[in-house]
C-alpha cells in the first residue's frame, strides 16, 4: 500500500494500469483515502489550535469535509466527462481508486503553511495523471476536469468560510 502511495506521489503513471480493474486495490483505496483525510484534518486542527481548541476542531472538521467533497467532485466529474462525453474507458471504481492514491500525500501536506501550497500544485499534476491514465483521455480534457473540480471546491470554500466567519462574528464559535 505505501509503495503505491509513494509511486502515485512520484507521478509513476505505470501504477494506474496496475490499479485498473483490480478489486483488491479498489478496496485498499478506501483505506488510503480515509487515512489521508484523517491525517489532513488533524494537521489542519493543529495549525489553528492556537486560536482556541473549538476553533481548531471546527477547522479540522471543515478540512475533512472539504477533502471528502473535493475527492467526490473530482471522481464524479472525471467519470461523467471522461466516460460519457469523451468515451474514455474505465469504471467509476477504477477512477476512484486511482484518484485516492494520487490524492493521499498532497492532501496530507496541504494544511501545512507554504508546503501546503506546493503540495496543492503537485496534487493537480498527480490527479491529472491518474485521470488521464485511468481513462485513456487527452491532456486537454483532463485539464478541464481538474479545473472544473477546482472551481467547485473554491465555491465550497467560499460558502463554508463565509458561514464560519458569520458564526465567529456572532460569537457562536
Q: What residues fall within each predicted segment?
A:
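Hydrophobic alpha-helical transmembrane segments in multi-pass membrane proteins
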Residues: 28-76, 97-127, 144-171
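Low-complexity, intrinsically disordered extramembrane tails and loops of integral membrane proteins
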Residues: 1-3, 169-173
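N-terminal juxtamembrane cytosolic/stromal segments of multi-pass membrane proteins
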Residues: 1-39
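Membrane-interface segments at transmembrane-helix boundaries
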Residues: 6-8, 78-101, 132-139
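Low-complexity, charge- and small-residue-enriched intrinsically disordered regions
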Residues: 16-19, 128, 173
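Buried hydrophobic packing residues in well-ordered domains
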Residues: 12, 81, 131, 144-147
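Helix-boundary and loop/linker segments of multi-pass membrane transporters
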Residues: 18-23, 50-53, 135-136
Amino acid at each position: 500500500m505505501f509503495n503505491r502511495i509513494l509511486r502515485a506521489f512520484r507521478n509513476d503513471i505505470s501504477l494506474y494500469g496496475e490499479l485498473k480493474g483490480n478489486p483488491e486495490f479498489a478496496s485498499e483505496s478506501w483505506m488510503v483515502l480515509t487515512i489521508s483525510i484523517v491525517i489532513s484534518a488533524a494537521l489542519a486542527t493543529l495549525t489553528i489550535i492556537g486560536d482556541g481548541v473549538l476553533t481548531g476542531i471546527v477547522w479540522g472538521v471543515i478540512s475533512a469535509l472539504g477533502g471528502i467533497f473535493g475527492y467526490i467532485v473530482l471522481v464524479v466529474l472525471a467519470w461523467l466527462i471522461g466516460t460519457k462525453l469523451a468515451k474514455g474507458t474505465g469504471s467509476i471504481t477504477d477512477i476512484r481508486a486511482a484518484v485516492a492514491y494520487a490524492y493521499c500525500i498532497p492532501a496530507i501536506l496541504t494544511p501545512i503553511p507554504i508546503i501546503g501550497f506546493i503540495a496543492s500544485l503537485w496534487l493537480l499534476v498527480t490527479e491529472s495523471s491518474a485521470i488521464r491514465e485511468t481513462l485513456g483521455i487527452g491532456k486537454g480534457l483532463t485539464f478541464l476536469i481538474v479545473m472544473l473540480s477546482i472551481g467547485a471546491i473554491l465555491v465550497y470554500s467560499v460558502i463554508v468560510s463565509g458561514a464560519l466567519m458569520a458564526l465567529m462574528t456572532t460569537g457562536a464559535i
